[in-house]
């Protein structure tokens, strides 16, 4: 009997001792709720969590990195198509877009005037850091955990690169904070240090992301090729910014940009969209509603009536019109700028502007003879171009240069206002070609072979003459830019190819060419 009592007592003591030393035995989490302690178990848990990051990045005003077409109240300005209004590419006509005009004119005062883009989004960083602190809890292979961590770190690096480009020094946070965290009151992280952390995030993403998530290039998750293009973009910005602003090392950044772009070009599954129609392919590519499987598109955002609408088609006229500066940058068909080419017919007659010019001009700006082709507001029978103040309905412009790139009448006819389905291309292969050529030129190591696998691929699509290192024209319009004629021409190609895709303002910033915004361009 004593032996039985002794064993029973010992058992009770052991249970109490263990219970007293291990609080986890007493911790019980709700079975009908998701908690941080019980959530991180399977790959599906990590995939579901990272999907919330894509939901957050949809807010283009708060997180302007993977820009598409913001819906709701901000839809009239929160689109990738409208960002060129900050630059010398567009002449906005809309009073609601005064912000773009103020920025361009250098009259946007901080902090008396609120910013529209990029000062918010810190909940996005918190969500990323929470995920990174918990992915390892899942009972799945390390390589699987790493690819979701890579997805989050790609977003974090991209976010902070945008912040550094906008503000310079920036508060860099890489862990979940509480109300007592000292980082809440810390000074901003120096730009150089922050950008090293950005590069580490992007390198991790390139190394760990899968080449294919198995989605068939649906508008789904960012893959390794997307990470390479984001890295190339960020490194090109940092390299040229440092070079022209005397802000630090440029060589390393330019080498990283060229290396990332070249790897995407050599090993990625992408190529330029080309059906062999130089007079229409460029425009047609930017009007495709479903980009699934498109060979040039690396990442895109899909819109569907009744799910997520593209409101921006309804505000297309707010862009005002292309500037004369942009139109004059298109080369003639002999490969020479209008200032040097005998083929240029002048602009006394509007139609002459399009004669003997790079086919991308007529696929970007409306030729009066193409109104039927693009179904461009034909209801009142009046001709185009139309300027503000001139009688007539339809779209009116500040410049006469009506934009048809991205314009898709078929996506508006028969639909209610603010309901469209035109997608947003966020990353495309052509940018890699342009980035590679520019980085190699800035490094001073570019060869004809480099041009042939980059810039000249873009020219082949529209049957324009190749750029030749030994015969680069010296355009008198750019002799005061302080760069070589070769770099002038590579920058010109970038401006033409990526018009109205949200690059021009940042390009002018990194090149230290803000003076171009002081010149009347309409």
Regions found by a protein language model. Give the residues of each.
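Short coil/linker segments at helix-helix boundaries
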Residues: 169-191, 241-255
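An aromatic- and glycine-enriched ligand-binding surface/loop that stacks and positions planar moieties
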Residues: 22-93, 195, 203-206, 221-391, ...
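Bacterial N-terminal signal peptides that target proteins for export
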Residues: 1-9
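Conserved, well-structured interaction surfaces
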Residues: 43-47, 51, 55-65, 88-167, ...
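Short coil/turn linking the two alpha-helices of tandem helical-hairpin repeats
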Residues: 164-166, 171, 213, 237-246, ...
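Active/binding-pocket-proximal capping segment
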Residues: 430-436, 446-474
């Amino acid at each position: 009997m004593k032996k039985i009592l002794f064993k029973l007592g010992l058992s009770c003591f052991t249970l109490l001792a263990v219970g007293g030393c291990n609080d986890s035995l007493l911790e019980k989490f709700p079975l009908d709720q998701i908690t941080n302690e019980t959530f991180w178990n399977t790959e599906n848990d990590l995939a579901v969590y990272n999907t919330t990051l894509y939901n957050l990045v949809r807010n283009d005003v708060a997180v302007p990195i993977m820009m598409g077409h913001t819906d709701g109240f901000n839809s009239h300005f929160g689109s990738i198509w409208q960002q060129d209004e900050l630059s010398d590419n567009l002449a906005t006509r809309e009073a609601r877009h005064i912000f773009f005009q103020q920025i361009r004119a250098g009259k946007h005062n901080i902090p008396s005037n609120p910013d529209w883009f990029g000062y918010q989004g810190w909940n996005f960083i918190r969500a990323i850091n929470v995920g990174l602190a918990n992915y390892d809890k899942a009972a799945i292979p390390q390589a699987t955990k790493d690819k979701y961590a890579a997805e989050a770190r790609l977003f974090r690096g991209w976010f902070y690169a945008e912040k550094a480009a906008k503000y310079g020094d920036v508060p860099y946070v890489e862990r979940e904070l509480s109300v007592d965290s000292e980082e809440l009151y810390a000074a901003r992280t120096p730009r150089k240090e922050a950008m090293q952390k950005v590069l580490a995030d992007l390198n991790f993403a390139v190394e760990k992301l899968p080449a294919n998530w198995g989605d068939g290039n649906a508008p789904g998750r960012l893959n390794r090729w997307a990470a390479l293009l984001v890295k190339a973009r960020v490194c090109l910005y940092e390299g040229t910014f440092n070079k022209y602003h005397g802000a630090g090392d440029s060589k390393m950044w330019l080498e990283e940009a060229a290396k990332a772009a070249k790897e995407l070009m050599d090993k990625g599954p992408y190529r330029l969209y080309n059906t062999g129609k130089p007079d229409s392919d460029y425009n047609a590519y930017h009007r495709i509603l479903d980009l699934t499987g498109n060979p040039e598109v690396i990442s895109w955002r899909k819109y569907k009536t009744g799910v997520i609408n593209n409101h921006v088609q309804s505000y297309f006229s707010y862009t005002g019109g292309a500037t004369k500066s942009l139109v004059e940058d298109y080369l003639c068909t002999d490969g020479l700028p209008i200032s040097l080419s005998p083929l240029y017919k002048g602009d006394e007659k509007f139609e002459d502007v399009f004669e003997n010019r790079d086919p991308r001009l007529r696929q970007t700006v409306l030729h009066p003879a193409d109104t039927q082709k693009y179904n461009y507001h034909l209801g009142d029978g009046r001709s185009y171009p139309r300027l503000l103040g001139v009688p007539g309905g339809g779209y009116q412009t500040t410049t006469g240069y009506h934009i048809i790139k991205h314009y898709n009448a078929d996506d508006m006819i028969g639909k209610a206002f603010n309901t469209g389905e035109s997608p947003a291309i966020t990353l495309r292969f052509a940018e890699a070609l342009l980035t590679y050529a520019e980085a190699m030129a800035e490094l001073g190591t570019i060869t004809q072979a480099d041009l042939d696998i980059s810039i000249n691929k873009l020219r082949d699509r529209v049957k324009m003459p190749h750029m030749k290192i030994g015969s680069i024209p010296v355009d008198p319009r750019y002799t005061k830019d302080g760069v070589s004629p070769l770099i002038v021409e590579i920058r010109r190609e970038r401006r033409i190819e990526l018009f109205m895709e949200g690059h021009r303002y940042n390009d002018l910033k990194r090149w230290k060419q803000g003076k171009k915004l002081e010149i009347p361009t309409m």
